[in-house]
Amino acid sequence: MTRHDTTLTPMDELAQNVAQPFERARAMPPGVYTSDAFLAEELDKVFRQDWFCVTRADALAEPGDYTTLDLAGQPIMVIRDRDGQLRAQSNVCLHRMSTLLEGSGNTRSIVCPYHAWTYNLDGRLRGAPAMTLNESFCKDAYALPQVRCEEWQGWVMVTLNPDAPPVAEQLSGVQDLIGDFGMQHYSQTFFETHRWDTNWKVLAENFMESYHLPVCHAGTIGGLSRLEDMVCPPGEPAFNYHWIYKEEHFTLANAHPTNTRLKGDRRRMTFLLAIYPSLLITLTPGYFWYLSLHPHGPGQVDIRFGGGMSPEFVNDAQAQSHFEAVKTLLDDVNVEDRGCTEKVYRGLCSDAARPGHLSHLERPNYDFACYLNNRINPA
């Protein structure tokens, strides 16, 4: 069995990979997916630097609504405070450094589960039992460190990078592309978390191309997915995209009769948006669903999976039954995607793994590789 050049690091291999024009492009090399060293670079240069999607803003609608996450090893909470402001802050107690909140929910205050130090929703320490005998203790000196948080198109985005450009500035091209869909007005109706046994980029790339649909999804949507109906233009620096036209009989994927924003063929267009590094959105005129991905080691990915409906369908008497059918379909599609992407990761770990040439329908994958190289190997 012929082995590849082991003197190159995965970072070097990625740089060589994207040096080829798209017309000669190959898939990314295996080490980019399987290497601990490459993952460390990603956490430092991608997930600590770029904006990460947490959830939809309407999922945190009331004061005290919160959700938690670990971003590049940093425990973070996103919470709506008493003034109605969404804020992200450290999820680590300032006493003995226990994490504070778990999962998602609603709380009147933030209480440490270890010694009951209690914080207001804005992160200021409200009280700490049995601290009066410590002469240097001052309650007013304690406040949870804040993390940058912005709302964009209804999404809650956070970053550990104080110098990252605003989300709206980076993604102005997305607004130009789908502004008439009114994505900021769509309502989230479900949210789940999952962990799959594959690399996060394998799942991201699986979303970015629809080339796999007829085969991987033969049991669900494959028969409705015509390769000739898929359009994959070159991507932008902060995102890539492609689109598919849906048949008119797929009611929820088409514009509602009361939708006056969308005209012509746009009333049946489905956009697949990949917002770097790891927000993946399927946006139709009637509903949306998304994945927000974070690595859990090289061989596992943590998935924040949600979706919902456009405002016209939210108010339609038949909408809930339509969406329940779509959610059942999405669950079945995810079973197929999980099987395919976990097989890919097992193959990537093989000594025989070699990157093959890309189809013209995998243009988004090439653009994603270029984005990663720009972050990992900056000029």
Question: For the regions a protein language model found, what residue spans apply to each?
Answer:
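Non-catalytic accessory segments flanking enzyme active sites
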Residues: 26, 30-71
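Short, contiguous pre-domain boundary segments
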Residues: 13-30, 184
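Fe(II)/2-oxoglutarate
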Residues: 2-16
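Rieske [2Fe-2S] iron-sulfur-binding domain
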Residues: 59-162, 166-176
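C-terminal catalytic domain of Rieske-type non-heme iron oxygenases
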Residues: 80, 85, 91, 150, ...
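Short Pro/Gly-enriched beta-strand edge/turn motifs at strand-loop
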Residues: 49-59, 128-133, 273-277
